[in-house]
């Protein structure tokens, strides 16, 4: 559980989407990741207070329902399902972008269709795919990012053989630290949120453990470490090694750094790791969207026939419905191949921002209600809340 909590949702949002963030904010992309990370961190603490005080069966929409009524629960529930359906689409397009480097003659839409079909079949055949693969995927991603930080950090400081001196000046050369202005840095923060999608699931899962207070506190701490080490530090390495205006918005800057450093085979290995990360998050998104649909059915907000399962207990209909947006993205990738992925990333970031704001608003209402009626249940409190 701890390993999945640290590396589970690291996918295209970091490995590929960071290129678009750097293109918007320049070296100040580091600030965008810090701002988004702070928003996520405090949101998880607010969510953690509600999870411990008022267990809601793993559904964020339940807290919106408790705070603002059934309509709010309905909107947040379907909004959350829609977000993960879009994540399925984004990760499929990202996987196609990576595969396209090895088979340049094949169009991106065909590769996106191949990735999406393969993962759909894998999830429909066996419900155990998620549990059996996610821990391994997380281990690969954690190891790869640590290696990237070591190699890239040494190169940026001029301590790597053949580096030719420190490249840290890339942080303020080429137009300055925030070459596009600070408004662009704030705009990039919304795109950054895509990279943090999934961290909220771990908090709710920890709340369902035998010791919810300890589990939630540990989950939030793990997220803090991940924000600092995986996101902020790795982006700092990228913009220190590469001039920001050479970073491709649709190609992994992590691979570009390894190519720049020139370690034999490192770029290929990183390309494989990025592809594994994309498959990992695509796998998790299919699982999560189907689980969210079951929650909507339980609440009476979705038709019951969508909850049908196969003889092996696989929620086939829920999984297939969660891939509909992905197949629409395949068509869009055929028509607008250069615009699909940035659009999907921005859409996911906007949905997550709304979700996080609703979680915080729900905590204000639910938290105040619990403080008045059952203050003894507040064993885990939101910081700075009266």
What are these regions (language model features)?
Residues 15, 56, 79-93, 196-209, ...:
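Membrane-helix boundary/coupling elements in multi-pass transport proteins
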Residues 1, 133-140, 306-316, 353-386:
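C-terminal membrane-solvent junction of multi-pass transporters and transport-like membrane proteins
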Residues 1-18, 23-28, 41-45, 57, ...:
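Membrane-interface "cap" regions at the ends of multi-pass membrane proteins
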Residues 96, 109-166, 196, 220-224, ...:
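Membrane-interface loop-to-helix entry segments
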Residues 16-111, 223-232:
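Extracellular loop-to-transmembrane helix junctions
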Residues 29-30, 107, 139-268, 272:
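Helix-loop-helix junctions that connect adjacent transmembrane segments
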Residues 62-64, 69, 100-101, 219-285, ...:
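TM-loop-TM module centered on a large, flexible mid-protein loop between adjacent transmembrane helices
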Residues 20-25, 30, 94-109, 129-138, ...:
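Transmembrane helix-loop boundary segments of multi-pass membrane transporters
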């Amino acid at each position: 559980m701890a390993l999945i909590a640290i590396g589970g949702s690291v996918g295209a949002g970091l490995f590929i989407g960071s290129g678009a963030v750097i293109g918007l904010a320049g070296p100040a992309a580091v600030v965008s990741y810090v701002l988004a990370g702070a928003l996520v961190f405090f949101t998880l603490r607010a969510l953690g207070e509600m999870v411990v005080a008022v267990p809601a069966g793993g559904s964020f929409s339940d807290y919106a329902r408790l705070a603002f009524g059934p309509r709010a629960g309905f909107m947040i529930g379907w909004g959350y399902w829609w977000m993960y359906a879009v994540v399925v689409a984004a990760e499929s397009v990202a996987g196609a972008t990576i595969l396209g480097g090895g088979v340049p003659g094949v169009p991106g839409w065909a590769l996106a269709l191949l990735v999406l079909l393969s993962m759909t079949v894998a999830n429909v055949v066996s419900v155990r795919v998620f549990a059996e693969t996610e821990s391994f995927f997380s281990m690969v991603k954690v190891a790869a990012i640590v290696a990237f930080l070591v190699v890239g950090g040494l190169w940026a400081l001029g301590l790597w053989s053949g580096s030719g001196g420190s490249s840290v000046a890339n942080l303020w050369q080429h137009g300055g630290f925030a070459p596009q202005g600070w408004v662009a840095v704030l705009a990039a923060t919304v795109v950054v949120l895509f990279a943090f999608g999934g961290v909220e699931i771990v908090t709710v899962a920890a709340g369902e453990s035998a010791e919810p207070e300890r589990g939630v506190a540990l989950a939030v701490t793990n997220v803090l470490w991940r924000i600092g080490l995986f996101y902020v530090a790795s982006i700092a390495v990228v913009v220190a090694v590469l001039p920001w205006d050479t970073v491709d918005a649709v190609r992994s800057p992590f691979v570009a750094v390894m190519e720049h450093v020139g370690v034999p085979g490192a770029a290929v290995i990183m390309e494989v790791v990025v592809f594994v990360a994309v498959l990992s998050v695509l796998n998790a998104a299919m699982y999560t969207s189907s689980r969210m649909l079951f929650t909507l059915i339980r609440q009476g907000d979705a038709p019951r026939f969508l909850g049908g399962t196969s003889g092996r207990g696989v929620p086939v209909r829920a999984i297939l419905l969660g891939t509909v947006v992905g197949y629409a993205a395949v068509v869009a990738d055929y028509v607008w191949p250069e615009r699909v992925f940035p659009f999907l990333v921005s859409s996911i970031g906007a949905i997550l921002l709304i979700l996080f704001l609703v979680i915080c608003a729900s905590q204000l209402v639910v938290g105040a209600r619990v403080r008045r009626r059952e203050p003894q249940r507040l064993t885990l409190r939101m910081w700075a809340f009266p």
